[in-house]
Amino acid sequence: MHSIEQTIEVAVPVRTAYNQWTQFEHFPRFMTTVREVDQIKPSLTSWTLAAGPLRGTFQAEIVEQEPDSHLVWRSLDERPGHRGRVSFAPTPAGGTALTVRMEVGPNGPAGLVPGVSEVADRLVARELEHFKEFIEGVGQESGAWRGTIRNGRVRREESERHISGVPSWPHG
């Protein structure tokens, strides 16, 4: 597995950066390699990526998500197999330090072509720059999902639970 770690500071509060990051369907607006993201359910997304003539799709499960803190995912597809974590931390200036850590498997082209690891590092850094330009340019998030996910399951907070015991429709 190849490890990638990139950090960027954005000049918006943690809540704003986190809220925008949870809007996966908006990623094509600022990430050049992301063509489409479908949010199948709160913990499952389908991604279409393209770089030059190369195009691929994969599904990712959100394993853990904590508002204003972090999001952990893993791909459900073998090629290319990967997992990652994005963390959000406040900076002294009131902005956000956003750190992406990924592990990318050797299967697929990354395991066969020399230099692909370095290209992947640069690609993640470039896409984070695009996120920075986007969120600082608009200054506010386009939406938010403030749910918590543990072990791939949405966890309802105590304040959301229906006290009477009568079933209710989930929110979020």
What would you call each of these model-derived segments?
Residues 1, 53-55, 79-81:
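Glycine-centered tight beta-turn/hairpin loop motif at sheet-sheet or coil-to-beta transitions
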Residues 61-63, 74-133, 137, 142-144, ...:
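Beta-strand/loop substructures that line and gate deep hydrophobic ligand-binding cavities in soluble
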Residues 1-44, 130, 136, 153-172:
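Hydrophobic ligand-binding cavity/cleft-lining segments
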Residues 7-11, 38, 48, 61, ...:
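Generic structural detector for well-ordered beta-strands
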Residues 65-71:
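Short, surface-exposed linear segments at secondary-structure transitions and domain or protein termini
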Residues 3-7, 44, 57, 70, ...:
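Intrinsic-disorder/low-complexity, polar/charged segments enriched in Ser/Thr/Lys/Arg/Asp/Glu/Gln
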Residues 45-51, 71-77:
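Short beta-strand segments that buttress and anchor functional surface loops
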Residues 41-43, 67, 92:
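Residue-level recognition of beta-strand termini and adjacent short loop/turns
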